[in-house]
Amino acid sequence: MDEDRFHIEVSKALSSCQLVEEVLKLYISESYELARKCIDGKLVFKLSGEDVEDASLERLITTFRKLTDNEKLVAKLNKFKSERNYLSHKAIAHCLDPMGNLDWGYAGELKKRLDRIQQDSHDLRLEIHEEAKTFRAHLYF
């Protein structure tokens, strides 16, 4: 793997993390829409998807946890958050030697984590989508 390929792999993994965030935002937005529909003017309800538009992954998970009983999925999301935080804040720095060049030994090890992050992201997106099926039909009918 050359340096350009390494950076592409890191970018793909980070992009997959962003997709998890987007799916969580959609779940939260649709949950709020259903709540608004059920409340139907009986109570002021001003929560909306805009409230989480710029939210961190941690805040999205905290909000999601309040809208689901699926603690197993919440636990997976928290584990994923730890890996995503490592990737976002530490992984690339750990791949650099003191001169700022890529340490190929560590970069090779990181590649395994990047692949796992992408797979976990895919699996989580599917699980969140499945969780949304529990209420989505009520939103439109």
Outline where the language-model segments fall.
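Amphipathic alpha-helical interface elements
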Residues: M1-A55, E71-K72, N78, H89, ...
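Short amphipathic alpha-helical segments at helix-loop
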Residues: M1-R5, R65, Y106-E109
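Short, solvent-exposed, charged loop/turn and helix-capping segments
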Residues: R59-V74
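Generic secondary-structure transition motif, activating predominantly at the C-termini of alpha-helices
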Residues: F64-T68, K81, Q118, H122, ...
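Charge-enriched, short contiguous segments at helix-coil
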Residues: K72-E127
